[in-house]
Amino acid sequence: MTDLTTFHLPERITNTEAHRELGQAMVKAWRTDGIFQITLSKPQEQTTDEAFAESRQFFSQDFETKSRHVSALTYSGYIASREEVTAGEADYSEIFTICPDIGLEDARVRENLPCHGPVPWPGAAYRDRMKAFMGMLGTFGERLLQLIALGLDLDDMDTFTRLTQDGWHHMRVLRFPTVQSSENARGIGAHTDYGMLVIAAQDDVGGLYVRPPIEGERRNRNWLPSESTAGVYEHDDGWNFIKPMPAVLTVFPGDFLQFLTGGHLLSTPHKVRLNTRERFAMAYFHEPNFDAWVEPLEADAAVAPIHYGTHFTNMFMRCYPKRITTRRIMENGLLDKLPTLSELA
C-alpha cells in the first residue's frame, strides 16, 4: 500500500507559475506512483454518491432484467460477469458501459459506423445521474489535461484538450462479486487502459492495485498488436494496493498519453482482486474525438499516427469477442468504414 499524492483541482486553469508548478507535481506523482488523487467538494461528492446509488440499484436486479440492456450498434450496455476477457482469461466484473449516447437519426448511425448508437439505458433516473457524474468528470478531465500540458513544459496548455473536443468520453460502471477468500481472487486481470486519461471512483471496500514505474522494467506499447499489456507482470511483485479514501477520485494516464509523450508518461498497469464484500467502482475515460488522428508530440517518421476510433473499436472487439456488437461489425464488414493510414496521406 502507498500513500497517494492528493491535489485540489482549480476551477479554471491559467498559464501561471502556480499552475505550472501544480502540473509539474502531478507529472512527478505519475512518474513516481503511476496514480494520484483529486479531492471532491461536498456537492461533487453528492453527485458521485448519487451515481453509486443508481449503480447498486441496477446491479441488484436479476440477470434477465439486466441483460435486456444491450445493443448491437454500440458497446454501451450491460456486460455480464465473465463476458469480458483479459489476456485470454475471463474477468469476474459485472459492468454497465456508457459510451456517447448517439440517436438513431444521427448520420453516423444511419451509415453504420462501428460503435455509434443510443445507450440502452435501464431508466431515466440512471441516465440522469450517470450523465451528471460524467459531465462533472468531463470538466475535471479538461482541466487535468491542461495542467499536465503545463507540467510537461509544453508551449500550449491546450495541446491535449484540442484532441478531446467532442471526445469519445465514456465510462465503465462496475460491480465485483464477493468471494470466500480474497487471496489471489481475480476480479480483472492486469492491463493498461487503451485511452488517454482515467478518472476513477471506488467505494470503501478496496481491491484496486496499480504498478508504478519501475526503473529498468520494460513497459509494452499496448496500442501495438504485438505488445499487449494484458496479463503482463500480473503475478510479479511490485503492485501497490490503492486504499479507498473518502471524497477523492483517482487519476492515472492511459496508453495515449504514453504514446503522445514518447514514454515520458507511462500508462499505468492495474488490476482488481475480489473481496469478501461486494465492491462497486466507476471508471471514466476522457478521450480524443472518435475521428482524431493522434501523433507523438515529438515528430517521429518511424511512428505511425493512430486513428482513435479504429483503436477504440479494435480494443473493444478484443475484450468482447462474442458480444453481439462485435458479431455485427464482423458479419457486416463494418471495419471497412473506419479510416486506414493510407487515407491520411
Curated annotation (Swiss-Prot):
Its EC number is 1.13.12.19, 1.14.20.7. Keywords: Dioxygenase, Ethylene biosynthesis, Iron, Metal-binding, Oxidoreductase, Plasmid. Its cofactor is Fe(2+). PROSITE patterns: FE2OG_OXY. GO terms for molecular function: 2-oxoglutarate oxygenase/decarboxylase (ethylene-forming) activity; dioxygenase activity; metal ion binding. It catalyses: 2-oxoglutarate + O2 + 2 H(+) = ethene + 3 CO2 + H2O; L-arginine + 2-oxoglutarate + O2 = guanidine + L-glutamate 5-semialdehyde + succinate + CO2. The keyword 4Fe-4S does not apply. InterPro entries: DIOX_N (IPR026992), IPNS-like_FE2OG_OXY (IPR044861), IPNS-like_sf (IPR027443), Iron_ascorbate_oxido_reductase (IPR050231), Oxoglu/Fe-dep_dioxygenase_dom (IPR005123). Fe cation binds at H191, H270. Monomer. Belongs to the iron/ascorbate-dependent oxidoreductase family. A dual-circuit mechanism has been proposed in P.syringae pv phaseolicola for the complete reaction, in which the binding of L-arginine and 2-oxoglutarate in a Schiff-base structure generates a common intermediate for the two reactions. Simultaneously catalyzes two reactions, namely formation of ethylene and of succinate from 2-oxoglutarate. This is 2-oxoglutarate-dependent ethylene/succinate-forming enzyme. It comes from Ralstonia nicotianae (strain ATCC BAA-1114 / GMI1000).
